């Protein structure tokens, strides 16, 4: 039988706790993201995005930079007025979090799957794909 060094056990424990903490931190960043998105908070959204972020909108074949995204907030603010956004994390591992999000606009709703890559406390990549034209699958 092999003896496991207490140092190895300690190192493994610290690594696991840091991964759990990072996953929880990513969840908090995602929660902040949707809260800021709902009220079109340009300052908070800008703070959450890394300067070199790439935001891929699969359905329309567009990749936005941080500057592109922030510039679109005025238009988004009009679209999101009176809306609700519900989201739940489907999985989170290795800095990547996949979210199912229902965008419930006053006249329609849509179900999206969004994947965020978080590093150093900021969103460094995001991919958004439509799942359904309504939120019945949420």
Model-assigned labels for residue ranges:
Residues 7-17:
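Bacterial N-terminal signal peptides
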Residues 67-113:
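Surface-exposed, charged secondary-structure patches
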Residues 23-41:
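Short, aromatic-enriched amphipathic alpha-helices that serve as compact interaction elements
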Residues 1-7:
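Positively charged n-region of N-terminal signal peptides that target proteins for export
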Residues 109-138:
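Short beta-strand edge/turn micro-motifs at domain boundaries
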Residues 40-52, 56:
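Short, well-ordered alpha-helical segments enriched in acidic and aromatic residues
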Residues 54-64, 79:
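A short gly/proline-enriched turn/hairpin at secondary-structure junctions
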Residues 49, 59, 102-105, 130:
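A mature extracytoplasmic/lumenal domain signature
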């Amino acid at each position: 039988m092999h003896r496991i060094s207490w140092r190895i056990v300690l190192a493994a424990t610290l690594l696991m706790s840091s991964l759990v903490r990072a996953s929880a931190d990513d969840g908090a960043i995602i929660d902040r993201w949707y809260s800021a998105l709902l009220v079109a908070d340009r300052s908070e959204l800008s703070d959450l995005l890394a300067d070199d972020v790439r935001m891929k909108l699969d359905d329309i074949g567009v990749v936005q930079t941080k500057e592109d995204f922030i510039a679109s907030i005025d238009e988004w603010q009009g679209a999101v007025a009176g809306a609700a956004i519900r989201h739940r994390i489907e999985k989170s591992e290795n800095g990547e979090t996949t979210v199912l999000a229902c965008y419930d606009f006053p006249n329609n709703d849509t179900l999206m799957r969004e994947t965020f890559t978080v590093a150093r406390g900021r969103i460094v990549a995001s991919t958004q794909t439509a799942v359904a034209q309504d939120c019945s699958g949420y």
